[in-house]
Structure formats: C-alpha cells, structure tokens
C-alpha cells in the first residue's frame, strides 16, 4: 500500500515521523505517541495509545517503525479517497443539490444508467436507505447504505 505514495508524500511523512520519534531512535513508542497526541490537544489513555500502536505494529515489537508508519498513513489516505468518492456519488444523485436524494432523483439517475425500475422498486430502495423515515435519503443515510455492503 505504501508503494502508491509519491516521493514528496514519503518525505512529508518522514518529517511527521521525526516529530513523533522524540529520541530519534527510529521507532515511535506509546510514550512518544502520547506526547504528540497531547500536544495536539488529545488526551488518550495508555490503553488507547497501545491500541493505536498495535493497529499498525505489524512485527509485534510494541513500537512503530517508519515502514509501519507509512503503511498507516497510506491506509488513512485510502480511506479519505473512498469518502470523497462517496461524496461525489451523492452529488450525482442529488440533482437539485438540496442535500437529499428524492425518489424522482433516484429514478432519473437509475434510468440514465440503463436501469428500468418500477416506482415500487425505487420506493423500496429509498425505504431501505431512509433510516429517519422522511421519505428521502440524506448524506449520512447514503454513506450508511454505501458502506454497509
């Protein structure tokens, strides 16, 4: 995953890594992670810090080295991409830009995609995604529908 990063991104992450790696030994400990998190106004518990490290600590030595840090950053960037894709997809459906997808808008887009749906099928799709029951799909509901697969 880290191989999809540009040299510029890698250089930026190297700088960020150095900020975390207070003693410059090439690894980030829970203590160092805690220091940086607190300087950013966060107040993680020891257990939370351990969880954060364990999430990316692929060799299981209890610290994060630079390759592990890169993988973590690449993963975060990938998640952001898919969020942006979902936002774009929502805009495609939300023809009038009011922040909601109506049955008419859904039918219009599905028809353009070559999907001939009955009114009943369109209503059913709206009902499935419409968790607050207002008869249309807002962005949160759309995200829920897109990520529940």
Swiss-Prot record:
Q: Where does Ca(2+) 4 bind?
A: 130, 132, 134, 136, 141
Family matches, as Gene3D superfamilies? EF-hand
Which parts of the sequence carry N-acetylalanine? 2
Q: Where are the transmembrane segments?
A: none
Q: Which domain of life is it from?
A: Eukaryota
Q: So where does Ca(2+) 1 get bound?
A: 21, 23, 25, 27, 32
Q: Which residues form a coiled coil?
A: none
- Which SMART domains does the annotation name? EFh
What residues bind Ca(2+) 3, as annotated?
A: 94, 96, 98, 105
Query: Where are the N6,N6,N6-trimethyllysine residues found in this chain?
Result: 116
Position of the signal peptide: none
Q: Where is the EF-hand domain?
A: 8-43, 44-79, 81-116, 117-149
Sorted alphabetically, which keywords does the UniProt record give?
Acetylation, Calcium, Metal-binding, Methylation, Repeat
Q: Name one GO cellular component term.
A: myosin II complex
Cite the binding residues for Ca(2+) 2: 57, 59, 61, 63, 68
Q: What GO terms are given for molecular function?
A: calcium ion binding
Kindly give any further remark recorded in the entry: This protein has four functional calcium-binding sites.
- Family membership noted in the UniProt record: Belongs to the calmodulin family.
Query: What's the stated role of this polypeptide?
Result: Calmodulin mediates the control of a large number of enzymes, ion channels and other proteins by Ca(2+). Among the enzymes to be stimulated by the calmodulin-Ca(2+) complex are a number of protein kinases and phosphatases.
Record-given protein name: Calmodulin
Query: What species is this protein from?
Result: Suberites domuncula (Sponge)
